[in-house]
Amino acid sequence: MVNLTIDGRKITVKENTTIMEAAAQNGIPIPKLCYLKGINEIAACRVCVVELEGKEKLITSCNNVAKEGMVIHTNSPKVRRHRRTTVELILSQHDCECVTCSRSGNCSLQTVANDLNIIEIPFKMEIERQPWNKEFPLIRDSSKCIKCMRCVQVCEKVQSLGVWDVEGTGSRTTINVAGHRTIEEASCALCGQCITHCPVGALRARDDTEDVWDAIADPDKIVVAQVAPAVRTAWGEEFGLSDKEATVGKILDALKRMGVDYAFDTTFSADLTIMEEGTEFLHRFTAGELKERPMFTSCCPGWLRFIKSQYPHLVRQLSTAKSPQQMFGAVMKTYFAEKLGVSPEKIYTVSVMPCVAKKGEKEMELFYQEYAGHDIDAVITTRELTKMIKSAHISPDTLADIDSDRPMQDGTGAGVIFGATGGVMEAALRTAHYLLKGENPPEDAFKAVRSTGFNQNQGIQEANFQIDNVTVRTAAVSGLGNARALLDRINKGEVHYDFVEVMAC
């Protein structure tokens, strides 16, 4: 154990604890912009500096370890002056149009600047603006980038793709797509991890809300919306709703009040995916097609983009089943359009999804005899949904917990567990068991693949199951870096599975 003093308080922490962690553990927050534990500990922003007695220069708290006898000051006049100047310099190279920023009210830089009471910038503004394709699902605004390196590190260390890199030197240092490529040329999986970890509004998903509003206002369009299982757990945070209050039924009611004609829960089409995927696995497994390499799930578009660019020889091992999002669109523009007695072109399908990769997935062009075009016409994220609710002046307190429209009202519990890593695998195995045995398996028969052990097992959960004295070897993987490690082991023959689920995030 290490004994030290922070802001006059004597504290004791474990060895190898950073000063920032030691302070946080004792209720002393130190501001930061670039720090991500275990991923980005390079002290690039210099906002987390503290004063160490006996040392003239300030030190960064995020990557300096607490040592015996240290006396630290986190908010001395010297620290405040340095921290304020640092943030003012960052702001002088940052587009401070906060009102029109997607991260307004949820921005680390905005919070730090407000806490330091910065009301004017004493330095000359020098804002960099790089061109970007605004049609791409992921949008980068270079004028808001603070060069924190988070996107670079998380893409390289967590997702193993290295889409982002540093360009230039000195004051001209910036972040851009690696290898002097455009984002379309890079191997971006659209996993969204760079967006999630960006502390400002430099990275965001393309906003498609106006397309949805236009469709709602078009009298010739029948707008049909679906809500993914994962959205129900996230949308309420923006409105301060508890998990019990933030139900999918209230989302459906909000969509109806916005003007959507029909609203459904994606759990229905998730059941369709599971039936197809479970049936396909059973066929390929019993036919001996999986003796060398496993069948992979196909419902995560980030994973699909990854395997197509990084392991094209394994694409044939993917399940041929569409994702629930795409199946929903196909059903709406064929069966549902027929039931309504309208042409497929009149149906405008909207997906409410938690993932930017779904915006890329919907843009795959598909042609059928019944109709030509996209299964899904627009995808909005959870954040876009909450913005639409606010812009429609809908108070969450007034929303009713309504049911999905018929005939796609009923669904099993399989679709709900899609939101958890391992949930697709568990649902598919339960379906395969039923198709093989003619009866449902015990409730917890395949729950092992959806355990909480991913963090302890490098993002991989392995499990073997016995069905009629036959062993089925499975694995569920979370994160593309972990997926790469597993695929390399499969290619080398070090491990063998029959069925593998991969989720990009």
Locate the predicted segments by residue.
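Eukaryote-biased recognition of intrinsically disordered, low-complexity regulatory segments
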Residues: 1-7
